[in-house]
């Protein structure tokens, strides 16, 4: 076999081996996606209950429904204060092979920093995932907290420390507001990069929650009640307990959402790699067939020429 044919054949075999790997990785990512979607659906039931009760309590507790930014009785997680420093909790992956997942989240963060005039002097980073931590540390940013090694389906117990730390640093006035930057899962082929304010809890955020609750229906088609609760011993005591839980549910929910998007992005990246491998194999196979045909034609011509010369 000519050297050129042997080289093409080796490339075909190598590409086929790579395709087997990417195809297997796609299947694994898809399985992880299905698993975390089931977990998220279960968690969402709890989160929605917390949101519904909180909206009801705030509306009954605040003198002017959901206009509470200066109502200190609702707690420091609601009260606005002058912004001297901004905290950003950015969620990325620990590894690559996730397509544009990490780069898009980082771009969204940088765009928000530019929009708000944020820099290394007035920004404090908390990072979930090695990629984001390394990116911002290399650029001289203040990374106050790092969390790596998030499992494929993170439990609240696993990420409890980062959730508590994000809230505690705000309460300790290390920063005066907290953004969270992550990739929101839309569907298996689409995601949306978000950089949203988490703390202080905003009126707009609760109004949106209130609207979602109002549009939600129970399994029998009856609207889910969001405002009829009897609270003991007092609204204030319940708010003291519920407001931190609400903030924690927002942060943990974003981590679950980001991990779901990561698995979807990984599955799509591996699917794209497998498709590209198929295209390369087809092209190489065509080259191989043409080269083989040319080699056969050359051999026939040489044999025919030799026989003619003998005559």
From Swiss-Prot:
Keyword Transport among record annotations: yes
Family note: Belongs to the ATPase gamma chain family.
Disulfide bonds: none
InterPro entries documented for this protein: ATP_synth_F1_ATPase_gsu, ATP_synth_F1_gsu
GO MF terms, alphabetically ordered: ATP binding; proton-transporting ATP synthase activity, rotational mechanism
Keywords assigned by UniProt, alphabetized: ATP synthesis, Cell membrane, CF(1), Hydrogen ion transport, Ion transport, Membrane, Transport
Primary residence: membrane
Membrane topology recorded in Swiss-Prot or TrEMBL: Peripheral membrane protein
GO biological process: proton motive force-driven plasma membrane ATP synthesis
Protein name (record): ATP synthase gamma chain
Protein location: Cell membrane
GO cellular component: plasma membrane; proton-transporting ATP synthase complex
NCBIfam families in the record: ATPsyn_F1gamma, PRK05621.2-1
Organism: Limosilactobacillus fermentum (strain NBRC 3956 / LMG 18251)
